[in-house]
Amino acid sequence: MPRRSNFLLIILVICAMVPLSWAVVSGPATELTSASGSAAATQSEIENQSEELQNATVYPRDVLTYHYNIFRQGQTMLEKVLTPSNVNSSTFGKVKFFATDGKVDAQPLFANQLAVPSGVQNTLFVVTEHDSIYAFNAATGAQTWKVTALLPGETPSDDHGCSQISPEIGITDTPVIDRQRGPHGAMYFVAMSKDAGGNYHQRLHALDITTGAELFGGPTEIQAKYPGTGDGSSGGFVIFDPSQYAERAGLLEWGGKIYIAFTSHCDRRPYTGWLMGYDAGTLLQTGVLNLTPNGNEGAIWMAGSGLASDGQGFIYLLTGNGVFDTTLNGNGFPINGDYGNAFVKVAIPQLTVADYFTMWDTVGESNNDDDLGSGGALVLPPFTDNNGQYHYLAVGAGKDSTIYVVDRNNMGKFNPNNDDAIYQELSGAVSGGVWAMPAYFNNTLYYGASSHALKSFSISNAKLSASPTSQTPTTFPYPGTAPVVSANGTSNGIVWAVENSNPAVLHAYDATDLFHELYNSNQAGARDQFGPGNKFITPMVVNGKVYVGTQNGVAKFGLLP
């Protein structure tokens, strides 16, 4: 039987979103997709899962992972303080700033009612590109603890002459917290560093969330090899070189394993697409998958979005421009195992490709750096069509301005002539291209493309609307925006989005009509401003507060005193 912490992740999703059986257009679903992904779960399986969920420890107001849940839906449905009527410049604004020693590229995390040496408090966790990890009292702003991921004699990595993560590279990825691990709970993240001899390191850390102490004998040096003759190969294996990579994608915990993925520095070869698994209790490597082992490129970065899962034993991710083998085997898979520029479904814990989709002109898109990998994958709840048939879907979009909706049980694979095998394709729906994560709330999908408005697409009859149902009056400069939604159930929905400008701007919109802007942080002059923008930032909303990462800390917004 799976350990209880696996079900803790599910119950956090449930508390923040939907009943156990999800929510669908026509009402609550009575079936769940089975672990095989090919059939409905039996009623007894659902009941067994329900019992496990009821027995798990519940922390309903925690934010322990990127975009609230493993589906990466970006919605919290427990918000009872912030409403469309009180989020305005007269009653809402910046109330605190948590200063840090470096850029905050990762989404902050939050543990409700955490016991620390000084008592019990709501705790905000922040990581920086200076390789520092902070725990703050979320109410007072007092620093509970601060530790470094650096070993003696080390510094954060230099930026390799690449402006994508600059001026230093430390902790870019959003961590994941498991409150059931270790004596008080564990936070997992990957940190990059450089030693006095000029050697680069990528390490997986697990910290006690009460003290900041390393757990499980960590940190673990990340090393890997995989059969292949692609970029950076030697002796029939592609070799993971820590100097060539950065870990930008948010970490995923599922089934007692931590999953991490890597991208390049400014597409500078040699590099390939790495996905790795580690045991959450020992930090020992449990699996490695390379998605371009006999080719090149095809890395995983997704603008900092978290690796997504359906909770049924599969990861969903998008790869960047790279080699895709257009010659397929009898089952429709690339003969050399190269999946550049693709929407990929990976079976866990074994880390094998279970299915995929890529567009008919994938080679041309990769050659033009017009790939899918700049956006994140989002797993949608089950929907029923007008015939009562269930559909299990995931969605992704990248630089080609198209929203791709895949059937998770039959993603579509590759057809050299057309994309007819995909479930739904909305060409040109996100003009400008996507360098961000979407959000889902109440049968609506929200996408913020680069240099365009944030748009909403409704879902009906298990299909996305062909055109936006609303859009913001605001145009979001590169890289667009990664929204989140706060609500009390399905009421009082607010869409939050950060504009990457100077100064950066936090926006709030009515979730039912994006043209109705409720608030932005420029409306009160300097009072609510928080410095220049930081790309790929996504807000985090919890307990009536909104937290936004910046170039030197985290800004906190809430109702004014």
Predicted regions: what they are:
Residues N417-V430, P468-P473:
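Inter-blade linker and blade-boundary elements of WD-repeat/beta-propeller domains
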Residues R527-D528:
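A conserved acidic, glycine/proline-rich C-terminal tail/linker
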Residues P2-I10:
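N-terminal Sec-pathway targeting helices
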Residues A23-V58:
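N-terminal propeptides/leader regions of secreted preproproteins
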Residues I10-S21:
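Bacterial N-terminal signal peptides
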Residues A453, S465-G480:
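Detector for outer-membrane/organellar transmembrane beta-barrel domains
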Residues Y59-F383, Q389-F414, W435-F457, G480-A487, ...:
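Mobile, glycine-rich extracellular loop/lid and propeptide segments
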